[in-house]
Amino acid sequence: MILYPAIDLKDGQAVRLYKGDMDKATVFNDSPAAQARAFQDAGCAWLHLVDLNGAFAGAPVNAAAVEAILAETSVPAQLGGGIRDMATIEMWLGKGIARVILGTVAVEDPELVRAAAKAFPGQVAVGLDARAGRVATRGWAEETDLMVTDLARSFEDAGVAAIIYTDIDRDGAMQGPNVAATAALARATSIPVIASGGVSSLDDLRALKASGAPLDGAISGRALYDGAIDLAEALAVLAD
């Protein structure tokens, strides 16, 4: 399993939100590029970047911070937040982002996901954010009647590289991931699933691994910044 350290960008800084609330942001580093370099130097093979302002605005907002991260690091980075049209997808991939994450648009315009995945094989992931198994969109502000497993399966023939599954009620709350729901999704679809939301201890990573589900990896943010998860130990746990 791959450990994806999260760098959530708000107003040019690396922050973490509590349960997706933009008014409950903790700044962890005012230099996201330095933070990214630290993760790379510690042995991380990927970076997970989120343009939080972009997710709410529907268009890129923290482009300068993302570009600074790309200039400072050499490991691949995936990026989500405010990517809702082909021009933005092409822009980010052209700047060196390895994989774009389509969230809201995967619900509102699934044909864009299909077109992008076809045009850029291996470089388009879908971010599915859920509350009680139902998909939420637009920076988690709107809930839908769509079930996560149904939406995931609908993209199986599209060539989507990965699904990033976030349980909103666990995100940034340090309560542990929803292992059962994450494992169930990974078993229900042929698309690689990356666990996100609530990974707050080494035991959480062990639980995801012990689920036996075919998980590609796990994203962790706050726990790495707080020191609740030792990065070297986490990499070792997932590498076993």
Curated annotation (Swiss-Prot):
Record keywords: Amino-acid biosynthesis, Cytoplasm, Histidine biosynthesis, Isomerase
Predominant cellular place of this UniProt entry's protein: cytoplasm
EC number: 5.3.1.16
Keyword Oxidoreductase attached: no
A cellular-component GO term for this protein: cytoplasm
Subcellular location: Cytoplasm
UniProt pathway annotation: Amino-acid biosynthesis; L-histidine biosynthesis; L-histidine from 5-phospho-alpha-D-ribose 1-diphosphate: step 4/9
GO biological process assignments: L-histidine biosynthetic process; L-tryptophan biosynthetic process
Enzyme class: isomerase
Catalytic activity: 1-(5-phospho-beta-D-ribosyl)-5-[(5-phospho-beta-D-ribosylamino)methylideneamino]imidazole-4-carboxamide = 5-[(5-phospho-1-deoxy-D-ribulos-1-ylimino)methylamino]-1-(5-phospho-beta-D-ribosyl)imidazole-4-carboxamide
GO MF annotation terms: 1-(5-phosphoribosyl)-5-[(5-phosphoribosylamino)methylideneamino]imidazole-4-carboxamide isomerase activity
Catalytic site positions: 8, 129
Ribonucleoprotein is among the record's keywords: no
Signal peptide location: none
Family, as annotated: Belongs to the HisA/HisF family.
UniProt cross-references to HAMAP family, sorted A to Z: HisA
Name by which UniProt lists this protein: 1-(5-phosphoribosyl)-5-[(5-phosphoribosylamino)methylideneamino] imidazole-4-carboxamide isomerase
Native organism taxonomy: Bacteria, Pseudomonadati, Pseudomonadota, Alphaproteobacteria, Rhodobacterales
